[in-house]
Amino acid sequence: MKKLALLLTACLILAPLAAKDDDKKKGKKPKKETIEVCFVLDTTGSMGGLIEGAKQKIWAIANEILASEPTPNLRIGLIGYRDRKEAYVTQVHDLSDDIDDIYAKLMKFQAQGGGDTPESVNQALHEAVTKIKWNKSKKVLKLVFLVGDAPPHMDYQDDVKYPEICKLAAKKNLILNTVQCGSMASTTPIWKEIAKLAEGDFVAIAQSGGVAAISTPVDAEIAKLNRELGITVVAYGDSDKRRVVRGKIALAAEAKEEGAADRLSVLSFKSKAVAEVSGVGAADFTSAYVDGGGDLVDDLASGRVDFDEVENEKLSEEVRKMSKEERKKYLEEQVAKRKELQK
């Protein structure tokens, strides 16, 4: 997984550097990059270690991308694939800038089934190119990462085969990178060919993904802060939106200690980018805790919603029952707690 993170970071961050350096030489402010990434993951049983590693590392990878200056617009998509006659052939989740939502979808991936080779690689890769709603601009960096251990079925007559898929990718300015897990001999030449045909990179990593959770002395403290910040969230929106927000908070609270810091950092980077665009000064800046909106405390702290403009029907039943005075006091306390915790 370390090699995968390094490959991803190199492709995402180093690729735009030349253009940024040119801007600096000309005295221009570097333009904000837009980056779109789709992970195409083999979710059969042999990939258990890698899938669990991805769940641990997705925040770290997003953090690495967002740390570049200026903070890029990042959208991530996911495709999980197995094979025909399995519980599913593919599960497609389109590009989203809501990293909390992507994390929730990734958490639902379980490595099961398989046991034989090959797998439905061609179908998954074709859907990454044709079903994902990629930005049509040539200025947007668009990357696919095919991660798996088994070669594609070449005997499915109704499949579009990978050589043709690579041609389609080129027409859409997509770069296809391949990550081979383990050392299955029949996979290596195909993974290398896909990367070569689609101007991408190939890397081989251990079947387990090489994930080692490294804790630091402050991890427990940050995990505690993560949970305390979650308590300050007031879900706001229609019933579906409030349900989604509650789900995100629950997943965040369960995040492993070593992942909590990366998650908070990602949200801080994204909030600062929004603040820069809207002209909010550093002294007034408050980081969001829930990606994708739906947190009234964040809306109030950022000035998007005024205390007197809170819509009753968008509140949970518990908060709705409060008198107007009680509600305002409660919300002011939550905003104050959020700011105190984020000092």
Model-derived features: positions:
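Divalent cation-coordinating acidic motifs and surrounding scaffolds
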Residues: 19-219, 299-312, 316-320, 324-326, ...
